[in-house]
């Protein structure tokens, strides 16, 4: 005759099952959310029927002479998002993919755009991430976990290094930071896609609570966020950020002989307000050392200077006369905190 189980044993087993089911649902929801995010990116990357011209909360349509604007074509999937103000000129050689990550809601951006990436399929590396900063992207949501994932929807297995979900010896450095996307969980989680990452030294990308040191890249990101916090409801900051991957002299190494580690990182920044346009850029070598005492002003340059250093034509969708003026002019006095 079997010995009846005590109530305590039954309770323990039921509690164990409850915990297991809770964990299962937790990860199931994560993967479901990830799949939905990637499907959103795929749908709008490949489709050319949507209207993406202009800015998130500005009309921004190019209505003046513009010889170097991005033109939707078969090569880029007739993607009208490439006409947005934050976009630089697309690379015309090699195999590239422009991936536009979108949200299911258009409450934050009229086209639902979160951020966009130019991915070099030959180098298996991201060249840049571009995005907008305005009141619509700011909120109270903060990252819950470091849930990094590959974009297996938009990239084939031979277009990214699948064995490097972790960057040995380096941080997985966000190019569009999760801290710039706090209005919703959806937009924040999207920033953890690996196409938005570059290998960065922790002393460049991180911080030390004990010593109070902050990485130079983190300080630049924090300063950019402070500028965005001061925007009025109708102002926008347009950003294009990335690391150098196109020249061997601008690469530190390749992890495992494969994954590129950029030697330099940059930010091209364009602010549109009631006073008009203002532009500036950051350029810095990535080093494995705290540089807390270095001023941000030391690394601030004009957009025109950054274009010479990177070979990238930033904010090409602006009218030519506006672009020329804003890129050559850098006035530190209008950028508080430098």
Provide a role label for each language-model segment.
Residues 2-20:
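Short, Lys/Arg-enriched N-terminal segments with co-localized hydrophobic residues
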Residues 22-33:
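Bacterial N-terminal signal peptides that target proteins for export
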Residues 33-41:
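Hydrophobic helical h-region of N-terminal Sec-dependent signal peptides
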Residues 42-46:
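C-terminal motif of bacterial Sec signal peptides marking the signal peptidase cleavage site
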Residues 48-338:
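Domain-level detector for secreted/extracellular nuclease and nuclease-toxin modules, and
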